[in-house]
Amino acid sequence: MKIVTTVQEMQHITKELRASGKSIGFVPTMGYLHEGHATLLRKAREENEIVVLSVFVNPLQFGPNEDLDRYPRDIDRDENVAKENGVDYLFYPSVEEMYPAEQTTTVEVVKRTDVLCGKQRPGHFAGVATVLMKLFNITLPTRAYFGMKDAQQVAVIEGFVADFNIPVIIVPVDIVREEDGLAKSSRNVYLSQKERKEAPHLYRSLCMAKERIEAGERNAEIITTLVKEYIETYTKGTVDYADLYAYPSLQVVDQIEGRIILAIAVKFENVRLIDNITLTVK
């Protein structure tokens, strides 16, 4: 595995690889890699001749009161995960390398951002789309892999790639969970012992809702109320949202039909966790 720290070298490598006909699978991350990321890397390894991983904590997607400085970092661990999962190139640029001067251009996302996490994080998805435009141009991927844990991000990226005719295939990958159902996340380390015991109830609330939908319930408000009440009963967390939308358009639905997403965000003392399920309802 080769570690690359400059845009110029990474772009030179990927241009040569693509010119020689090689397919490139790209996994963009902010580091502190866990089994969820490893799953993305293994999928990229299966489907491409070359795998590129980027580790870059992107300041553009953090708001003024968000946890940029607190975001966990451990490049040695990331290198080990990368090597174990068949990465060919680890792109690890500094902030100065990615943003040598103030941006004269950023990507503004105008749809799919005013709900769920995007509603409370104005500018977040503009930061995501801007860094991805840069990373796609640097790594020239055939396919790029994203976890469905952040399903809103996947919906935004799919729209952005289609709108700008970017020649990359977006591959969404299912959420990876702990044995007790908790979605794997770099932020789980901030849960107290007691909160960690309560946290699996987030996924259980979604499973309960899925069962109700499969049993015939079609009223979106009834389902989201059930989820909120379940989480408030079984955890000390505060429900930020429990919402149901058409997917990937993220349009509001009153009656449940077609492909939908049921997504939740719950605040514990030192961390906010998100989870979701998507399902197709006939």
Curated annotation (Swiss-Prot):
Q: Where along this sequence does the record place binding of (R)-pantoate?
A: Q61, Q153
* Residues annotated as binding beta-alanine: Q61
UniProt EC number:
6.3.2.1
> InterPro entries per the record?
Cyt_trans-like (IPR004821), Pantoate_ligase (IPR003721), Pantoate_ligase_C (IPR042176), Rossmann-like_a/b/a_fold (IPR014729)
* Keyword Acetylation (UniProt): no
> Which residue stretches, if any, does this entry annotate as coiled coil?
none
- A matching Pfam family: Pantoate_ligase
UniProt GO MF annotations: ATP binding; pantoate-beta-alanine ligase activity
Catalyses: (R)-pantoate + beta-alanine + ATP = (R)-pantothenate + AMP + diphosphate + H(+)
Q: What is its main location?
A: cytoplasm
GO BP terms, alphabetized: pantothenate biosynthetic process
- Recorded family membership: Belongs to the pantothenate synthetase family.
| Misc note | The reaction proceeds by a bi uni uni bi ping pong mechanism.
Q: What is this protein called?
A: Pantothenate synthetase
| Organism listed in the record | Bacillus anthracis
Q: What is the lineage of its organism?
A: Bacteria, Bacillati, Bacillota, Bacilli, Bacillales
